[in-house]
A protein has these predicted regions:
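Intrinsically disordered, low-complexity and often Lys/Arg-enriched segments
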Residues: 1-3, 71
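Charge-dense, helix-prone N-terminal extensions
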Residues: 9-13
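A short, structured beta-strand/loop element
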Residues: 14-46
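Short acidic-hydrophobic surface loop/beta-edge motif
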Residues: 3-7, 26
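C-terminal structural segments of small proteins and small subunits
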Residues: 47-72
Length: 72
């Protein structure tokens, strides 16, 4: 699973050939979550501040993430 970014202890991953809908995986300490790129639905648990930071990162990189998803 390729790591696509790391910040504030949050590690973001994008699996190749993963199931739809487009999403990324992230870890923060013992927390493991998936978050959809388009509608930001979260699967898993993490502190609200961490989810907010991941959402801001996705906002800044949404087009690039969707392009990577299509190529994967």
């Amino acid at each position: 699973m390729p790591e696509i970014c790391r910040f504030y202890g949050i590690i973001l991953y994008l699996y190749w050939r993963d199931h739809n809908p487009p999403h990324i995986h992230f870890t923060y300490g013992e927390y493991v979550c998936n978050i959809r790129i388009i509608d930001r639905v979260v699967d898993g648990k993490a502190p609200a501040k961490v989810i907010a930071l991941v959402n801001k990162w996705i906002d800044a990189h949404e087009a690039e993430l969707l392009s990577l998803w299509e190529k994967a």
